[in-house]
UniProtKB/Swiss-Prot annotation, chains A, B:
One of its GO terms (molecular function) is histidinol-phosphate transaminase activity. NCBIfam families: hisC. Belongs to the class-II pyridoxal-phosphate-dependent aminotransferase family. Histidinol-phosphate aminotransferase subfamily. The modification N6-(pyridoxal phosphate)lysine is found at K226. Transmembrane segments: none annotated. Homodimer. Pathway: Amino-acid biosynthesis; L-histidine biosynthesis; L-histidine from 5-phospho-alpha-D-ribose 1-diphosphate: step 7/9. PANTHER family: HISTIDINOL-PHOSPHATE AMINOTRANSFERASE, HISTIDINOL-PHOSPHATE AMINOTRANSFERASE 2. One of its GO terms (biological process) is L-histidine biosynthetic process. This is Histidinol-phosphate aminotransferase. Its EC number is 2.6.1.9.
Length: 367, 367
């Protein structure tokens, strides 16, 4: 059967390995498997959110309120926006997919950093767009500017802070860059890990309302998957001027998040104390990683997220390290598919991190 | 800002009104609102599934197993297929979206019945495809054949049984039609309500394995939203030859269903007794609708689903009837947007149906 030609050039996203797979393939008991691979919140979901979902589980037969009135209202209040500035997605992933489908077609141009969230490129290829990347691994706005002057772009992706590397642009630099961008270019500011970055360094904080008021061609994306501990529930949001939101809405399918996801997100917004507590612990534990990696003589990228990227240089092969850890029930993310000889490790709970250090010692001794 | 031109012609799907909206707009207590508008299973979700989700609610922070190994394995066993014949979607809606994006681009042709599931056309317009519809409201395969000979088609949609009208093609007629279709045309057999149709009349039963073995250009879509009582959890599936599945997989985003949706679907498949019991009650109650409508002198379309379409002819205006019912806390689906002077009513529980008859009597007397 014939399919669209653009699909020939499309690869599928390599998701982090689930605990179930390690159980199946290596026969390790699920309670002995530690997953530090998908930047899930290791402290679990807020007990208040869990209780709410247990109470509402009986509503699984009912479609969600597709207007998402209550969630949009809560987000609008928190971020000082109008509901008409908001669209909800099945993870913020889905909203970046909407952006690409709304703006791009074959031979449209999409500008991004060399090593950034893989879905930008994958979604771009779905519509046959041309992907333009900087030479630098990390976000380098001078290179972005040069490439933009040379090629133009229908969409620019800025991942602030950047997944999978962890670095983060300063807000002021982002603003200076945005001033130079044509109003017909949609700039996607992916803030999936913004809560972490803003906690660590106020200079990194992007205020969504100020961003979209100052730059009407920008859209801010946020998620409940990381700081809000709802990775499994697939809820993200986009904030932009209503003209953009209206066009994205044309692409959104009805009922694009589940009834329980909607309820969980609404409840999670009520428990900011839990969120802040998790973020605080995250950076306490990250110090241990920085010390460990330095002691071992490897390099790491200073991180503004809930993960850290450890580079093995010419000492070890990251793919082998990740595989040996996997066989011991420790799942981390090998970055070979991102052309990095590095692993990305989610900052876990204290005892999980201690275990990671032990297993990494053991694995490296035997490689 | 400029957006893709095809979006100018895109309208958004009008979802059934949620209970929350009636509570907000008419100040009616949520426990007094009855929703017979979205073909949700009125008997709720299986208690076994509810218990499982309450147990697993703590896993909301974890991404799902993106291979969906266990769910695909269970579906493969039930339908005598291989896992490689299966793709899971956020509702079967999402899989029909995948089909359109895999096969169609601007000016591709999509053939469908005049009055059928609205998303076929909406997704088609997202890619700028040409929508070709039969003159007959209900599925008429002779007209499909004539139009196919005249125009060809990249995709043909057959909704068996048909939403929102309720009629259902015979399996043998579908097979005769499929024999005449070119192998490069993808035929989507949307079986969202097949469990109901097959229960009522064996001649309507489509066996997915036999369908895709006989016609390698066909894909069968099923859902957990209707008979399996998980409308709010957004889980559907597509069965096809692996060549088709592989291409749809290129378009699927990772983690396209939630962790709890995956668990709920797996558990729901284990409780077929609940499903059969609900379907049996559905057709018992449908008899009451047929008697009521006949007594009132209206027409209905004999239905192979969990809803019934009631036509008001020149006696009443369906939009007014639906609105007056809404103000009394009874939500039904007005079909004006489908160009029908009719309402579609989900077959509810006995007491809900009794209430609908009472309120409809009251409303019609005052119109």
């Amino acid at each position: 059967m014939r399919f669209n030609e653009v699909l020939k050039d499309v690869s599928t996203y390599e998701a982090g390995k689930p605990i179930e797979l390690v159980v199946r393939e290596y026969g390790i008991d699920s309670k002995d498997v530690i997953k530090l691979a998908s930047n899930e919140n290791p402290y679990g979901t807020s007990p208040k959110v869990i209780a709410k979902i247990q109470e509402l589980a009986k509503n699984m037969c009912l479609y969600p309120d597709d207007s998402m009135y209550e969630l949009k209202d809560a987000l609008a209040k928190k971020y000082n926006l109008e509901s008409s500035n908001i669209i909800i997605g099945s993870g913020s992933d889905q909203i970046l997919e909407f952006c690409i489908h709304a703006k791009c077609k074959k031979d449209s141009k999409i500008l991004m950093a060399k090593t950034t969230f893989a879905m930008y490129e994958i979604y771009g290829k779905h519509v046959g767009a041309e992907i333009i990347k900087t030479n630098s691994e990390q976000h380098n706005l001078e290179e972005f500017s040069e490439l933009y002057k040379k090629h133009g772009a229908d969409i620019i992706f800025l991942c602030i802070p950047n997944n999978p590397l962890g670095e983060c642009l300063d807000k002021n630099d982002v603003y200076e860059f945005l001033k130079t961008i044509d109003k017909n270019t949609l700039v996607v500011v992916d803030g999936a890990y913004q809560e972490y970055a803003a906690f660590k360094d106020e200079k990194k904080r992007i205020c969504p309302k100020d961003l979209i008021d100052t730059f009407p061609n920008a859209i801010y994306l946020g998620t409940f998957s990381k700081a809000y501990s709802l990775g499994g529930m697939r809820v993200g949001y986009g904030f932009a001027q209503n003209e953009i939101i209206q066009n994205l809405y044309k692409i959104r399918a009805p009922f694009n998040i589940t009834t329980l996801s909607l309820a969980a997100a609404i409840e999670a917004l009520k428990d900011e104390e839990f969120v802040n507590d998790c973020i605080s612990k995250n950076f306490e534990e990250m110090k241990r990683y920085e010390e460990y990696v330095t002691k071992k003589g490897f390099e790491y990228i200073p991180s503004y997220t809930n993960f850290i990227t450890i580079k093995f240089g010419d000492k070890y092969v990251s793919k082998e390290v990740a595989q040996k850890l996997l066989e011991r029930g420790m799942i981390v993310r090998d970055l070979t598919s991102y052309k990095q000889n590095a692993i990305r490790v989610t900052i876990g709970k204290p005892e999980q991190n201690t275990k990671l250090f032990q297993l990494l010692d053991e694995v490296l001794q035997n490689l």
